[in-house]
Amino acid sequence: MKLIIFTGLALLLIVSLIDVEAQNEGACLPRGSVCTTNHAGCCSKLGCDCYRRFEKGVEKGQKCWCIPTGLRYSKEKE
């Protein structure tokens, strides 16, 4: 009887873990999506990178995107 209960609980645990993992995979932001600074929203191997925007020397806020970790964009010299 104990074996049946233990087996049932083990199966329930496995099914619960699989369901949680599937929900977490669908909730991430793909590459190029707008994100916030909390890095948790981007999919794996992506980071939330933020850049300050300026127009005519005046700061116009900050934009953040999910981009590959370690990738850096720079302004092209004119």
Curated annotation (Swiss-Prot):
Keywords: Disulfide bond, Secreted, Signal, Toxin. Pfam families: Toxin_35. InterPro entries: Spider_toxin_CSTX_knottin (IPR019553). GO terms for cellular component: extracellular region. Expressed by the venom gland. Belongs to the neurotoxin 19 (CSTX) family. 07 (U7-Lctx) subfamily. This is U7-lycotoxin-Ls1d. It comes from Lycosa singoriensis.
